[in-house]
Structure formats: structure tokens, C-alpha cells
Amino acid sequence: MHVFRYLCRVMKRRDFIRTAGILTAGAIAGGALAGGCTAPKGFNFNKLGTGSGLRLSFRPYELELRHVFTVSSYSRKTTPGVQVRIDYEGYTGYGEASMPPYLGQTVESVCSFLSRIDLGQFRDPFRMEDILAYVDSLSMGDNAAKAAVDIALHDLVGKLMGQPWWRIWGLDPAKAPDTTFTIGIDTPAVVREKTRECTGRFNILKVKVGLNNDKEMISTIREITDLPLAVDANQGWKDRQQALDEIFWLQENGVVMVEQPMAKERIDDNAWITERSPLPIFADEAIQRLADIPSIKGAYHGINIKLMKCTGMREGWRMVNYARAEGLKVMVGCMTETSCAVSAAAQLSPAVDFCDLDGNLLITNDLFRGMKVVGGHIVLPDRPGIGIQPL
């Protein structure tokens, strides 16, 4: 009943009657997509099903990067992904799984997991807790695959409600911090080129460090711009005293925060750095899901929430609130993703301290129109769900 009360409050009467009719018909008839429904072009329907409710379909989609992307542990020119959709009574929710190497997931593992999901047993998409708890129960891992379903379900339900999720959560989009734009480890010439491309477009840059050329990277960028910088070591620093010395040098050169200085397993060393650092230290690889937060408290000043790590928007929103209650700073980030997953993560942006939501800007083959970055500012669309439109 709480959903109907919300709908009464936020919708025009005509829209409420239409949506209420959809929900009632779904509850009584079990959905009209059973039987003769065919998969959208290029998508594979999950044929596993015990009912006639929600319909899940998916297809692989490789993301092509504008530049070779290098961090302290690998380089790549593409990122494997899987596009997901959930169909219900003429409405479609879109989701996405993106699998950079360190997640340990592949197109094959994601598709295998998705093929085991029986959403047809659910005739009411508003049973979000039940649906996502069921999906989560199917394995101990597969977080990116779970995130794809979570994002698609949130998009679908937001569309049924006629509202974007930032509004459903009671957030003010004007409070979203500026997003960083990421510059990967590269030669000085390429770093200069990437930095020039950012001129006038962003107000803060994120720099990948963690190899033996960190100071060269920062100094090269400083030849072009004096914008504030965030740095991400991706667990690349090996000695805690050297890491701390470098952090003091970074502060002197306009860096405002540091992500994951040392290996996530070295909790004591990361805590030692955090205690002495003049800059806020954020956990990235060290934090995956909500249950991880107690284990990192005291070792970092804040956490980086990524939907592909935490299984999606439901848990991401819970992590924001839990971290705040524990006195931690919060950052929302992304992988290399289309505007689908980036726009989903952006729904959280008004509630966090830092944003790194540039994954869609790093690729050449986006599939959607969604959140925008204008003069470095995140602009959240007023469209319902996660605010995206297929291109």
C-alpha cells in the first residue's frame, strides 16, 4: 500500500490511474508477456521460468575505449560487458554488467548466472526486496551480473512510478559534487594530450598512479593545468613510508584525495597511512559490499561505492547511509560503462562527497543518453527510472 500512497502524492490523477491499472492487471493476470513474447533483436530471453511475470533478456556488448587505459596492474583498450533488460506490461528497464579484469568476472560467467534467474515467478515488480534477495541468493559472487538485474529493475520500477530515483530517495540533484575525469598511466606526450582534452570541461581530474612514474605523471599534468587532482594508486604502492612521503608531496601539488594506496589485504599498513595522511584516504578494492564496511572502519577515511562491486543501486544506497552513520566519507564511482550504469550510479551522487562518474565518457560506442556532465557538473535528467534513453 505504501507504493500506492506514494503514487497518489507524486502523480497526476490520470497517470496514477494508468499505473495503478498496470499493477492491478499484473497482480491478477500475471502479466501479458507470457507465451508469445519474443526477445528484442540481439537479446536472449532467459527461458527458465515458473510463471508469467517479469521477463529477463541479455546480450554481450564490448565497450571500446577512446584511449588505451592503464592502471598500476594492467592495460586495456576494450572492456567486456553484458546489456540486460527486464520487460513488464509494455515497460522496459535497462541494466548493464561491466567486467574490468580485476573483478574476476567474464561475459561467459555473467551470461551463465543470468540464465539461471527465474524472474517469471514474480508478477509484481514492486516486490523489489524479494526479487533482489532472490537474485543475490543464487551465488556468493557474480556481483556485476547481480548489479545488471538490480539496475534494470530500478529503471523499470521508476518508470512505472513516473519518477527518477534521485527524487524517490528524496535527494536534491543540485547537491551532486563535480565529477572527476580519469587520466590513466601513460607517456608524458599522451598525458599532455589527455589533459588538454579536459580543458574547460572538468573542474577536478583523477590520475592513476602506483607505478614508478607517479611524480612524472603529476608534474606533466601540472604543465597544462592547475585543476585540483584526485589520485588512485590501485593498490600499487608497496612501502608505507614511501607512500606517506608521496602523499605529502601530492598535497603540495594540488591533490585533494587518495584512493587505495596499498594492497587491500594490508589493512594495518593502510590504517597506518590513514592515521598520518594530510589527505583523505578512500577504500576502493578493499570495499565491495555493505558487509565489508565494519572491517575497514579505522583503516580509511571513506569508501568508494561502485554498483558493479556492491550488486547495484539497492545496496549502494544502503552503503551510503551506513557509511554516513559510521562517520565515513563517501564517493561513488564506476567502471568503464555505458550511460546506463553510469546514470544509475549518478542517482546516488547528491548524497556523496566525491564523484568519479566518467565511464561513459571514456568509450566510443555508448548505447544510451542519460546523465550529462556540463562544465564539470553532473546534470541528472528528470526522466523516470535511471533517466536514460536508448540511442
Segments the model singles out, each with a brief description of its role:
Residues 2-8, 15-37:
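N-terminal export signals
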Residues 9-10, 32-67:
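C-terminal segment of N-terminal export signals and the immediately downstream linker at the start
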Residues 47-58, 74, 87, 92-160:
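Metal- or metallocofactor-binding catalytic centers and their adjacent structured scaffolds
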Residues 48-63, 81, 89, 335-391:
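Flexible C-terminal active-site loop/helix
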Residues 84, 90, 149, 162, ...:
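Conserved, mostly hydrophobic/aromatic
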Residues 165-277:
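Metal-dependent enolase-superfamily TIM-barrel catalytic cores that perform enediolate-based chemistry
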Residues 246-257, 297-303, 347-368:
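Structural recognition of alpha->loop->beta junctions
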Residues 268-270, 276, 282, 287-357:
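Catalytic alpha/beta core domains of metabolic enzymes, predominantly
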